[in-house]
Amino acid sequence: MALGAFKLDEALRSLDAVQLAKVSGRLVRVSGMLLESLGCRRMTGQRCLVEQADGSLLEAQVVGFNRDITYLMPFKKPMGLTAGSRVFPAEEETALRIDDSWLGRVVNGLGEPLDELGKLTGRDLLPTELPRVNPLKRRPVTEALDVGVRAINALLTVGKGQRVGLFAGSGVGKSVLLGMITRQTKADVVVVGLIGERGREVQEFILHSLGEEGLRKAVVVVAPANESPLMRLKAAELCHSIAAYFRDQGNDVLLLVDSLTRYAMAQREIALALGEPPATKGYPPSVFGMLPELVESAGNGADARGSLSALYTVLAEGDDQQDPIVDCARAILDGHIVLSRRLADVGHYPAIDISASVSRCMNQVSAMPQQRAARNFKELYSTFEKIKELIPLGGYTPGMDAKTDRSVQLAPALERFLRQEVGEGSELGVSLATLQSILK
């Protein structure tokens, strides 16, 4: 009897080792980066594994469905897929855990390390969804943020918790100015999202803009242009979740995203592949729904401790300030700094067009004397810009208008104030004192 029971237990244990049949589907169509499968039903947002020709498994996410067809978008470029390739439901994704050990690390859009410094661990759970803050509980912007750039500190003062866009065409100096702000801004934690940009710039930004000292207090999330659109979306959302985590720990956080336009382009690729109709300049409606959701996840939280200031670069294609993404970003951000190609072409750096730029939180974080001085500076600079081309032609006669005379007299000082070397810093107090000394 005992021997029979022993053999039965042994037989039952051997059954546990038998691999049972897996639920699977099959690929029926591949179009670009969009995969269509039949028979593997998953909810949107869940993941599947697609078997490739060499036996490796390609991870993909469900982005939509049509009756029995499930639409998948892979995280990496597919290699060796065939009609009928098997599709398996992936196990539940492991939640990311985070703490201060993430500082100094470089990761991809899935939170996987790229710096070969070992696996990332942590004590706290990092939410997979974008953080949300009740608008009635969000702490207002009341304190100025020193970014170390004279023109911004004095004329376009930003606050802790403000979200600002850096608008410019290609090759006008967005990344250079972003690097200046990264080095000069006093923040406890810096979170950098390099989304859809050139891979060459990743190492350059880490070495030159952050530096060894800056990297110690930073987390860099990378998804260069050769990554799949889904990975670019994930990277942008991940850096916002990381920044919100450190904000809620009581830190003053600076979030830098380069660029918001590439995030919109990634969503455009996915939406068009799914058959969504294009609208303005080829951007489907879903793009303009996702941008506010991303931006609103930044900013101050409900807690009295900590802040999250965000700076987004926005590419104005063809220097068009009415580009749909530029226009949308201008509406949802708390301010915008416009870089001018005309200024960049004459060697004026940073090429900030102060007449076209605005900080919507400046009145909340600056005193009235500074606001008056900034308005006076802009007025004088704008007046000189209007008549400077007439001066060599003899079209300007001194004594005809006092304001014009004063703008011409102060023009060299105004120009010097707006220019700043890449390695030069200008603290907030020094910037304000210099502004007052010019206008006295």
Tell where the protein language model's regions lie, with residue ranges:
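N-terminal accessory targeting/assembly segments
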Residues: M1-R105, L110-L114
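Phosphate-interacting basic helix/loop segments used at nucleotide- and nucleic-acid interfaces
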Residues: K7-L12, F88-A90, V147-I152, C239, ...
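Residue-level signal for beta-strand positions within conserved beta-sheet cores that form or flank
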Residues: V23, L58, A83, W102, ...
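A generic structural signal for well-ordered coil/turn residues at beta-strand boundaries
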Residues: V23, S31, T44, W102, ...
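Flexible glycine-/small-residue-rich
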Residues: R29-S31, G39, Q52-D54, G64, ...
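Active-site phosphate-binding and catalytic loops of NTP-dependent enzymes
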Residues: S56-E59, T94-I98, P113-K119, L136-T142, ...
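P-loop NTPase nucleotide-binding/switch module
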Residues: S85-V87, T94, L114-Q162, S175-M180, ...
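P-loop NTPase catalytic core
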Residues: A154-L155, G161-K440
